[in-house]
C-alpha cells in the first residue's frame, strides 16, 4: 500500500552510504581487559563486535567518508548539494559544529549545521533535511556520524561494551510522488540523567575534578532506558502508521535504532510485527547512536532486503530523551536531469 499522499514530503532518498573504521573490537577482546565475557554481552545486548576509530580519527572524518559514498550512490557531486546536515552527539569540537568541517572537506560552502538528538538524530535529520528539500531546496546530504567510544569509560563494563563508531549518510532529493514521511517526533527532558554525560557542558564545565571523577563519560540507567525506549518507539511507530493510514502488515522492513537486540525484538513484538521484518546490525556495529539507522539501511540494501516500492519504518530513541519514527518508500534510483529521483 502507498502512504496517504497528504502526509508525506515530496522527497526521496536518492542515495545512501556508510563508513566503518577498519579496527574491529570483539567481545573477547573486551573480556581480556574487563570483567565480562562474550556470553554476558551477547545474551544481554546481542552485540558481538563493534568498530572503533583510531585515536587520530574524528567524527568529521567518518562523516566525510560516508557522505562521499552516498553522493556517488546518488550519482551526484557535492556541487549539486544545497545543504549538509550532520546528526551527531560526539562533535569534533564544542565550537564550531561538525557539519561546516564536513562541507569544507567535501569542497562546498553551502549551509551546513549539526543536529544533536542523540540516537534519534538521523530521523530528526531526515525531517529537517526533507523540509528543506520540500520547500524548494536542491538535494540535501544528511549524515549520522559518531565516535562514541571516546565518551565511554573503558573500565565500566555496563557501557564500554555497548558502543561503536561509524557513519551513515543519505542524499535527499525532490520527488513529486512524495516518498518521505510521515514523521512522529518528540522529546521528554524531565529526566535527562537517565542517559547522559553529567559534565562537559555549561551546566558543569570540564575541569580536573570532572575528569578525575569520570563525569565526562556516558552514564545510564539501563532498566529505565529499556522500558522507555520500547514504549516510545512503539508509540511513535504507531503514530506514523496511523497518519499514513497503514497497518503493521504494510511495512516491508523495520529499521530501528540499533541499541540492543532485546529492545528491537520487544518493539516488533508489541507492534505485532513479524520479527523477520526487522533488520538487525547491532551484533556487528554495537550502538552507533545517530549513525545506526543509516548504517543498517546500507546493510539491508547490500543484503537485498530493500526493493523499489518497499515501505520502510524507521524508529529511534535516545538521550534527551528524544524519540521518533518515520515511514519512507524505498526508491534508490539516481537523481534525474530534472532533479527528481527517477
Cite the ranges covered by each PLM segment.
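Acidic-glycine-rich active-site phosphate/pyrophosphate-binding loop
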Residues: 34-43, 94-107, 142-148, 202-210, ...
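Flexible, glycine-rich active-site loops centered on histidine and acidic residues
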Residues: 130, 134-167
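Short beta-strand segments
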Residues: 14-17, 87, 116, 140-146, ...
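Short, well-ordered, mixed-charge alpha-helical segments that flank or form enzyme active sites
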Residues: 93-95, 122-124, 148-152, 189-192
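Claisen-condensing/thiolase-fold acyl-transfer catalytic domains that form or cleave C-C bonds
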Residues: 2, 60, 64-67, 71, ...
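Short glycine-rich phosphate-binding loop at a beta-alpha junction
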Residues: 79-87, 248-257
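Condensing-enzyme catalytic core mediating Claisen C-C bond formation in acyl metabolism
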Residues: 1-55, 156-227, 231, 235, ...
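Short acidic, glycine/serine/threonine-rich loops at helix termini
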Residues: 24-25, 95-97, 152-156, 323-327
